[in-house]
């Protein structure tokens, strides 16, 4: 079925910044998608087209909206491409753009159309979105993911002094996604009580992704808070810990500055890649850490390869790989990590996201589907993680509606699957 109409508009994300929303209309109805945006962005990501000053602090997206309405819409409609041919829809837009990083039309323009068209394709096929995505990826079975709840926020996501960006809990010992949500919620509320009693009510303010942002600087203190909350909730042994260090954010002149939020940070206290690796090893030996994301700068390749070779846990590439098949292949060749963080807006289309996922899975890697810190109520990635059967998702704390939109959709999907639902659990790396 051909596309009848495409219309884009400027809306707002969870940080109050403009973003792109796209409506695709077919004979089956209107299908809407909104594009997320990151705070800690990799330099190798596809280009998110912004208007620049003066309006909206330079973050307006009217250029991207205009590119959808005046360039993508008329040309894609005229092409007559069937909305169920996702690869053709995406290739048409990539060819129309003609640049390696989508800088002409904007990745945010292309992705909005790609996501909306995927929803339209599912309706055309009469399938739930997660099952349609599974068919696009060639998967006969689907799996419910382990949620990685970001419950303590630091780095560029919070106004505290914590260098590392995300301290997460993973209910790997749950028997279903529904139970994982119960565990996540209970640990979260126990964590709030622990933080309140130790640092006061002010410390219970939350960051961009719904996690708490207590005014602490010691990363080990953050991990200790998690361990205490897990124990108080009664889930020791059922909940593992994951981290996103976002180390590119505190990489300076070849070293790592764990006090990077302090404008008077002393260069003499910055540490080498090897010393940084020792910090991680100490954490791993003390806490039930099963996954570390972006432990080093996005171009500090030797450090990545060395750590991945030395430890057994999951090492996740985000800024390193930016969901880009070329970067993923380089990381595979150099054995730089063993898990891909999949963010649809880093690469800018559904088809390329599926390609990057399949490439990682075929290399024996894990894949974790991820939100961005600037999110909307769109819940596409919930269906994506089930359809691609990656077994793990991170989309914030069990707090803030733009985060719960994804988790609630996963609850609906598990209900829809009924007795056929399988939870990845402790096999989240290779479900």
Swiss-Prot record:
Its cofactor is Mg(2+). GO terms for molecular function: magnesium ion binding; phosphopyruvate hydratase activity. Keywords: Cytoplasm, Glycolysis, Lyase, Magnesium, Metal-binding. Its EC number is 4.2.1.11. Pathway: Carbohydrate degradation; glycolysis; pyruvate from D-glyceraldehyde 3-phosphate: step 4/5. Mg(2+) binds at residues 244, 293, 318. GO terms for biological process: glycolytic process. The active site is at 209 (proton donor), 343 (proton acceptor). GO terms for cellular component: phosphopyruvate hydratase complex. Gene3D superfamilies: Enolase-like C-terminal domain (3.20.20.120), Enolase-like, N-terminal domain (3.30.390.10). The keyword Metal-binding applies. The keyword Glycoprotein does not apply. Mg(2+) is required for catalysis and for stabilizing the dimer. Belongs to the enolase family. This is Enolase.
